[in-house]
């Protein structure tokens, strides 16, 4: 984290080699905290995207404007504030991004998501969840589905196994709910079941390459404490299951592996893609 202590005015004025307090700003600018360059670059890109997308896709423009605001706020949070609540002069940034033209909103968001993911390891760990959330939000607007699970390392084994167990639970929950839904909802449940079963197969195949594959339990309980008992509760349960899936995969994509020599960028990118898929389902 790029924090430094701002030199107190009293000490600056007392220094014999300075020509009075007029040098304070220059000293603070030099010794004070500075904006994270990666966050600044991403914020400028988001601002430029928002401007370029205004007429092409107002919703996408709004999303990128939100991202810019979040990134500038993160820059200020990392820099800290003085006793009067102001960000140090040394941390002030120009909020004007370099303008560019856009003809395809999906391409703009895809490029922005890719750039965001590439910069994840260039920012401090405490800023990564924000970048992950932004990448997920952009990919959630796409219709692209996650590809095959990339090759896992031993460091990824625990999380992959946990997610496989989670997918077992999702399949059980949806299968249970299907017994109570009305006929017009059965197709929706079947679509979601197929999606989660595909995730199960993909994770089983990936986990099998690095260790034993855990098998599903005979039954699972709901973390909400309640399972469906009729059509109304089944419909509400489906919403709960979709929301829980979004939370779980978003958390997984943001998770840091302790003592990992080098992050598995492809695995993290896949987790972001699955989280985005879950967001699309939950919003549908």
Specify the residue positions occupied by each region the protein language model found:
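N-terminal export and membrane-targeting signals
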Residues: 1-11
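C-terminal motif of bacterial Sec signal peptides marking the signal peptidase cleavage site
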Residues: 17-20
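All-alpha RGS (Regulator of G-protein Signaling) helical domain and cognate RGS-like helical scaffolds
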Residues: 22-284
